[in-house]
Structures are given as C-alpha cells and as structure tokens.
C-alpha cells in the first residue's frame, strides 16, 4: 500500500509520524486521551480497531498525521503544552507540509488543544474534538465521588504537574475561560458512556466561545455508525483547506 510510519524520540518522549502514499500537503496532530500512548514501535491508535480505521481513512485522504506519548497522563500540564509546540515546530521542519496544521483531540488531549488554540492560533487551521475534557476542575470534582478514581487522579496529576499529592488536592484546576479565536472547532460528542459529560465540558465550552464570536459547532451521536463520524471528520478538515 506504500503507507509508512516513522517512530522517533524527541527529548524523553516517543513520537510517530504516519506518512501517506499520496500526500495532500496538510498535517494533523493527534492529541489522545489518558489511556492513549506512543511507544518505540507501536501506538494506541494503531492497536485500537476504531482509531486505526480513522487513521487509515485520514491517510487515504493524503494527510500526514503525527502523534506523541506526551508524558502519558499529562492532564494538560504546562510541560505537555510546551512539548506539543516543540513537536509541531520539529515536524514542520522535517516534513513538506502547510505551516497551518489541523488538530484531532480526544478526551484529555483537548486540554492541550485548548491551550494551543488560545496561545498558538497562527499555527492551527482547525480543531476536531472527540468527547473532550475541557474543564479539569469539574473533572476533579467528579473523580472525588469515587475514592479509587480520586486517588488515581491525584497520583497522575502530582506526577505530571511535579507537585505532591497533598498539593494536588488543594490546587484549583483549569476551568473553561473563553477567548477570541478565529480557528474553527467542531466537537463530536457521544451521547452515552462518555467519560467527560458534555453538559459540563463540550456544551459550556461551545456556549462561552460562541459568545466571543468564535466558530464552534457540535455533533451529537450514539456511535452506532462510526464510519459516518470518521467521514464527517474528514469532511470538516477538507472544508478548512481552501485558504492556504
């Protein structure tokens, strides 16, 4: 088929770049959820049937995709945002790509996507979000209701933020703050079984951003036809490539 992957390490983190057979000149940065990973020769997106389908569909459309382990369960830590910016810069230097990239963020990955949209909008063409986590304080409050999940969350945050678990219990986490943005965002939100309830994440983000005049749309689905969702993500990216 002629499609190849290239694994590489930048600093401490493993990354992968997926090279299509017929490149269309556009890049997509995948920002995965908390259980997603990139190892030295494989990744969650390659191993998971559904994500692999989406990956293949986007590559068949000519997209160059890149993905990073990004410190694992980073929960939007500053080091993950800084690393994401460095990786974008590195990939754009290595590959012949349009300087404005698309973002494809799922779950926790949306915390980093949101920071990139806020502070590096000149590098971003559009952002697709799948069941995003956008209000970390709200997620923290919901995790508190289950002792096991709460302890796990504190452990992950303390490691990622470089603080003690005691400090992780006391700090105020990121909430949804609106900002002016001309970058189109589309959210695909699963109606049932999503780990981050849309009423406190996607819906609030959409309303606050729209009040700022920022373009945010949302599609609700039950995930009974994943291929339709994947096709609509492709269509969304294509629709924001008219201006180079």
From Swiss-Prot:
Alphabetical list of InterPro entries matching this protein: AB_hydrolase_fold
Superkingdom as given in the UniProt entry: Bacteria
Protein name, UniProt field: Uncharacterized protein YjaU
């Amino acid at each position: 088929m002629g499609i190849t992957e290239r694994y590489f390490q930048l600093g401490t983190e493993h990354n992968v770049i997926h090279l299509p057979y017929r490149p269309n000149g556009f890049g997509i940065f995948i920002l995965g959820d908390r259980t997603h990973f990139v190892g030295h020769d494989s990744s969650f997106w390659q191993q998971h049937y559904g994500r692999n389908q989406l990956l293949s569909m986007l590559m068949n459309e000519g997209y160059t995709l890149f993905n990073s382990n990004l410190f694992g369960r980073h929960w939007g830590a500053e080091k993950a945002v800084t690393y994401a910016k460095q990786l974008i810069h590195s990939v754009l230097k290595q590959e012949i790509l349009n300087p404005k990239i698309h973002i494809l963020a799922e779950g926790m990955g949306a915390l980093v996507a949101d920071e990139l949209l806020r502070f590096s909008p000149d590098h971003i063409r559009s952002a697709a979000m799948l069941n995003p986590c956008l209000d970390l304080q709200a997620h923290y409050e919901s995790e508190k209701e289950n002792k096991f999940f709460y302890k796990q969350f504190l452990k992950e945050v303390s490691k990622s933020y470089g603080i003690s678990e005691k400090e992780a219990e006391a700090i105020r986490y990121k909430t949804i703050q609106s900002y002016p943005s001309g970058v189109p965002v589309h959210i695909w939100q699963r109606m049932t079984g999503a780990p981050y309830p849309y009423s406190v994440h996607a819906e609030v983000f959409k309303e606050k951003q729209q009040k700022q005049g920022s373009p945010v749309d949302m599609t609700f689905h039950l995930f009974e036809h994943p291929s339709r969702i994947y096709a609509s993500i492709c269509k969304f990216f294509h629709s924001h490539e008219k201006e180079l």
